[in-house]
Amino acid sequence: MFEEYERLRSLFESRNAPAAIKLFRAKSAPLILFFLRREFKQTPVGFVPHTELVRRLASVLDKISFRDYIEEDDNDLQQVLDSSEKAELLIRKWSDQGFITFEPDEKGMYQHSLTSHSEKVLQWMDSLRKEDF
């Protein structure tokens, strides 16, 4: 009877959870969702160059209280004071977690795009907004 509950609990607690679930579980989910929507959806673009995405995230970090979003066990982010360095670490972390891609273009310059997991999460969030109003 509680098999479905156990399956869901296991899914949410697993280190191998799908990227969409990792995104919802992240302490920094509001920041991630805000930033990804802003950079990839407000003006639809396929790819954003790595250096540009880092620069834009650093600008956002300068305007918010980012320390509220740092996970307790994230020593790298706790030790970095500069917003550009934090942005670089976050972009790489988001790529490692499957929220965005990190791949070279035809010239060998690295760029990012949304993964299908993040696309679906943003679509779902949009559907919630439409129902709220």
Features from the language model and the residues they span:
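Preference for short coil/turn "hinge" residues that link or interrupt alpha-helices
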Residues: 16-17, 40-41, 93
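Positively charged, polyanion-binding regions of nucleic-acid-associated proteins
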Residues: 26-47
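Extended assembly-interface/linker segments at domain junctions
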Residues: 55-59, 63-133
